[in-house]
């Protein structure tokens, strides 16, 4: 019986063993697959990234779309938006909660084009980011409780602002692709200007 299980369902057995041996349980996975092969490949990729002790893997289009781009469904003003979506999209770093995260209501192609916009200072003032030319709707998630999963709790903030992102060169496709969302900067309610560094300056 055991030999049959090992030879016919090695991946299933591996997943069961991982569940038993890991001190932290993985997020529940939806088993209502539209495309079993694609979903299983995504699960294997997630497990590899989740349990890796090495450096974070370089970003991919699929990874950015899954973790950042908003899908139709829950209202952006919902106070539990971040708690629900971060769990559903498995937005974690190794076994730890991310301290902040952004979900954006835009197409991936639009986000990628921002990589070729002018540089502006990131919100930490150290690195350089690319800024969107227009306003984008999104949700900012800020960690309020716990540091390790599954106890992550977030406060959700709906925003409409300019997206600041960092990008990385991907050799396989010879293009810049989004790497991280640095900020979603809301413009002042009254008249303002952008100086040459892309920073908002309030006129006297």
Swiss-Prot record:
Q: What is its main location?
A: secreted
Keyword vocabulary terms for this entry: Disulfide bond, Glycoprotein, Secreted, Signal
A single Gene Ontology CC annotation of this entry is: extracellular region
Q: Does the keyword Oxidoreductase apply?
A: no
Disulfide bonds, paired cysteine numbers: 97-152, 115-167, 122-129
Q: Which InterPro entries match?
A: RNaseA, RNaseA-like_dom_sf, RNaseA_domain
Which SUPFAM superfamilies does the entry link to?
Answer: RNase A-like
Q: Which domain of life is it from?
A: Eukaryota
Q: Name one GO molecular function term.
A: nucleic acid binding
Glycan attachment residues as annotated in the record: 130, 142
A GO BP term here is: defense response to Gram-positive bacterium
Q: Name one Pfam family in it.
A: RnaseA
Tell me yes or no: is Ligase among this UniProt entry's keywords: no
- What's the stated role of this polypeptide? Does not exhibit any ribonuclease activity.
Q: What is this protein called?
A: Inactive ribonuclease-like protein 9
Its ancestry begins with: Eukaryota, Metazoa, Chordata, Craniata, Vertebrata
